[in-house]
């Protein structure tokens, strides 16, 4: 399918890392393009109604005035376009904050914990219509709890490294047992809450 994809972050280092990682999945095609750049999510360098789809993954919890990012996304998204947003789910994130003060104070880290109703309402109030909700990465939450518990030694911790190996194995092999565990645990300890919405704005209102 034809696709022009743009990826942005405020961190130049992270953008370079994304470019490097993308090369492993790049498929040469005249019908596809992928560009990366550094920008502020509150001031996207695009005209109104530029995109069919916008994904904002694990970003809003880092931004004090996150509403301005949602408004900017609404501006660049075409009427009827799809906006997918994810933030950390409340309970697993709350546990991280309780386990480690350093986790809270990490530069560029999370400045809030979203409750689902607030998250959903904040998006709907800015011109989006709710489509569906999805939870993900329940098996990843214990990994972050372990990092918070052993924050000072997390780079060398045996148990953290082993759990990371388990997560990589799970992602690569996708065994039936972990699929069942993920499904059962998602309503309780899913790491991420995802919302899928549609831009309900009329083109003439832009």
Please place each PLM-identified region on the residue numbering.
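Conserved SAM-binding loop
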Residues: 1-95, 118, 205-206
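Short, glycine-/aromatic-enriched active-site segment of Class I SAM-dependent methyltransferases
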Residues: 88-112, 121
